[in-house]
Curated annotation (Swiss-Prot):
The gene is rplP. This is Large ribosomal subunit protein uL16. Part of the 50S ribosomal subunit. Residues 1-22 are annotated as: Disordered. GO terms for cellular component: cytosolic large ribosomal subunit. Belongs to the universal ribosomal protein uL16 family. It comes from Acidovorax ebreus (strain TPSY) (Diaphorobacter sp. (strain TPSY)). PROSITE patterns: RIBOSOMAL_L16_1 (PS00586). Residues 1-13 have a biased composition (Basic residues). It holds the Pfam family Ribosomal_L16. It comes from the Bacteria. Binds 23S rRNA and is also seen to make contacts with the A and possibly P site tRNAs.
């Protein structure tokens, strides 16, 4: 699963996920992409599950790019622990997603195969997505 090798600080404040994606909002590497139209978080497990769904469907064909990286630690306190006594330990990592962000890209497969692979991947993600193709001349 994806997670940072090292971090300057173990824990991070919650913050707010606002605005739309101004970077990473177009297909840059492949021919087809899976773009999120919702705002939210993708955990490392969700990204990996979607990647596996794509890989299994296209079999040996094509090349896949993961355009997001889960670099934000989410901390939780254990069950049945009273409030206070400091912040909990980092449990998992998430990628903050704004509307318009391209999450996956693929090249080397026909459009119909890419559409079906991304449909299977989208079922693993908690956000609404749409299929996008590379713009010619962009």
């Amino acid at each position: 699963m994806l997670q940072p090798a090292r971090r300057k600080f173990r824990k991070e404040q919650k913050g707010r996920n606002t605005g739309v994606a101004t970077r990473g909002n177009s297909v840059a590497f492949g021919d087809f992409g899976l773009k999120c139209t919702d705002r939210g978080r993708l955990t490392a497990r969700q990204i990996e599950a979607a990647r596996r769904a794509i890989s299994r469907h296209v079999k040996r064909g094509g090349r896949i790019w993961i355009r997001v990286f889960p670099d934000k630690p989410i901390s939780t306190k254990p069950a049945e622990v009273r409030m206070g006594n400091g912040k909990g330990n980092p449990e998992y990592y998430v990628a903050e997603i704004q509307p318009g962000k391209v999450v996956f890209e693929i090249v080397g497969v026909p459009e119909e195969l890419a559409r079906e692979a991304f449909r299977l991947a989208a079922a693993k993600l908690p956000l609404r997505t749409t299929f996008v193709a590379r713009q010619i001349g962009a």
